[in-house]
Design a protein with these regions (language model features):
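Secondary-structure end/capping motifs
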Residues: 202-272
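Extracytoplasmic small-molecule ligand-binding "clamshell" domains
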Residues: 18-22, 31-63
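Beta->alpha turn/N-cap motifs
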Residues: 44-46, 55-68, 141-142, 159-165
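A local structural motif
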Residues: 31-41, 126-140, 279-284
Length: 289
């Protein structure tokens, strides 16, 4: 394809402030898109993971864990990702709950989807720290997890995104920081979410889209207040301070370009997932360009 010809691509990402911050320049056309159009769809990450199984979107936000099972259809872009330190999922519960004193009862854990990176980190963590504990998984939308734990419909909850900042207000306590566990284990940042592109779009198109996303990140860093209403529009009634915390935690230099350290982190995550049988082996290249 000649990338200078006008063409519209289906672009999907989440309503979370880190994604809307990264893509606001594209969504509001605050940068030159060079004749490329985007039909934008916004949904939660697990819904996007499921949509990618059917290759619903041309460019899509995915959890790294989901991408590991979709490499026959999608390849990874080096821009737009969420990696970082101190920003991994938290395992929370009500005060007094623990894995050490289960009374032989099978525990219930609410998670933001089976295909999420958070769930994979939970499985890695449990195999490493509590291999003897039995648990039942209840997948649900991330915004429903804390209420489920608070209302005793689940013993534990795996929380992501803005949940990191608000769980104490719901009377919940942290049981484990799975991001910290990963960092201690590997010495690398936590691979959380990524932007992937359909393999059949070809190298030239993939690289062009990657460049646009990188320029969008640059614009967002340089002009953080432009398009702020777009972020707020999708922020699920978050307070401005929580939105700012969210962006500061999940958007960083890795969002512009993974670089060597980011590549090492992603490679380590996939190696760990393959070793534990959670994603298949493949000879396909990981990166689109």
């Amino acid at each position: 394809m000649n990338v200078n010809q006008t063409r519209t691509f289906r672009l999907a990402y989440s309503s979370c402030p880190n994604d809307t911050f990264i893509f606001k320049a594209i969504a509001r056309q605050l940068i030159d898109l060079n004749g490329i159009g985007f039909d934008i769809h916004i949904d939660d990450v697990e819904a996007l993971n499921q949509a990618a199984v059917k290759v619903t979107h041309d460019i899509t936000k995915l959890s790294f864990a989901a991408l590991g099972n979709l490499l026959d259809r999608y390849a990874l872009l080096r821009s737009g990702a969420a990696l970082g330190n101190g920003c991994g999922p938290l395992l929370v519960s009500r005060p007094g709950c623990s894995f050490q004193d289960t009374g032989g009862r099978r525990l219930t854990v609410a998670v933001p989807g089976m295909g999420t990176t958070a769930y994979h980190l939970f499985r890695f963590f449990m195999a490493d720290r509590f291999p003897e504990v039995d648990f039942t998984i209840h997948p649900m939308s991330f915004e429903k997890i804390m209420p489920a734990v608070a209302d005793q419909r689940a013993d534990f909850g795996l929380i992501i995104h803005e949940g990191r900042f608000v769980y104490p207000a719901m009377g919940l306590v942290q049981i484990a920081d799975l991001g910290q566990w990963w960092e201690d284990k590997t010495g690398l940042p936590i691979p959380l979410g990524c932007i992937a592109v359909r393999r059949d779009l070809g190298l030239e198109t993939a690289c062009h889209i990657q460049t646009l996303i990188r320029r969008g990140v640059d614009h967002a860093f340089a002009h953080p207040d432009q398009g702020a209403d777009y972020i707020r529009q999708h922020a699920q009634e978050m307070e401005d301070q929580v939105i700012r915390q969210h962006i500061d935690l999940y958007v960083n230099d890795f969002s512009k370009d993974l670089g060597n350290t980011g590549e090492q982190a992603v490679t380590a995550f996939f190696a760990y997932a393959r070793k534990t049988g959670m994603i298949p082996d493949t000879d396909l290249p990981l990166f689109a360009c």
